[in-house]
Each structure stands twice: as structure tokens, then as C-alpha cells.
Amino acid sequence: YAYRDSIFKKPDARRRYIIHAVDYELSPISGPNLSYPALQKIFEGRDRSSITPTEIRNAIIATRSSKLPNPATVPSAGSFFKNPVISEECFNAIVAGNPGISVPNFRVEGGYKIPAAWLIDQCGWKGYGEGNVAVWHLQPLVIVNPERKASPDEVISLENKIIVSVREKFGITLTPEVEHI
């Protein structure tokens, strides 16, 4: 297992298994993981040992609630696209093509991870609506079905338009994180 990855996403396991229950084993001695930038900002200046699991939980819920639609009122599939990992050459080309704009990135093995949300936003999709589907106005990584009337074809059509526009502007092909069934 890794962040947003597991054997269940591999080709030989996809559509073969259904997860119906999960057991977690939590370490009672590990410290808080504050690697997410929003958490770093919230707990800036605090001694890590003084931060409780409840505080971290509440901070994560507040952060997500500020960006994501309420699933009880606005259906979505959550994060729709994976953050792409690109080569140093591709990253440098994006930086050169966007002077004066800070390109968010995370150095990873094999290159740079670029937030898909940033790429989508740079293509002008944030808040865009078409038919019964839309790109969430606070988080362009999320495709929503606000009226609960969207067909699978409408979602896939918007998905494909986003993929094409990001590829045309940046030379990066986004990969859906959602599982089409």
C-alpha cells in the first residue's frame, strides 16, 4: 500500500475484488503526520508533541469541508484525476511557459509531481458547468453532479474535455483516479 494506491488498483486485481470491510492497526507511539501544507499552516509554531489526534482530525475535516462539496447535498466522485509525475524536462518547459507564475510541485522519484487541480485550474475549468455536470468552484479536481441528473456520458464527456485541454496546454495527459464501472 502507498498513498492513494494499493494492489486493488492493479490490472490483475481491478474488478476482481470488492472491499467490504477494513481493519486498521494504528500505532500508539507514532507522532502526527503534518506533511500536508494546510496542516503545517494550521499547526505552525506548535510543539508537535502537544498536538492531539482529535485536533488533527478536526483540522483535516475543516480543511476538506472548506474545499470539497458536501456529499449529502452535492454528489461527486471525489478527487477525479491523479496528480501526474512528469520529467524534469517537462517541468522546466511548464515553468518557462508560465513566467511569473509559481508552478506547485513536489520532487518525487522520477521527476516532479504536479497537482492535477492546478493544471485543470490553469486551463480555466474551475467552476465550469455543462449540462448536468460541473467542475467544483472551490476545487477543480472534483467533478460534481449538483442536480443529481447527470448521466455517465455527461461525466465522461467533461472528463475527456478536461484531459484534452490539459494535454494541449501542458503536454501532460491526466489519468482518472476514479474507477469507471
Placement of each model-derived feature along the sequence:
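Phosphate/pyrophosphate- and phosphate-bearing ligand-binding catalytic cores of soluble enzymes
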Residues: Y1-D153, K169, T173-I181
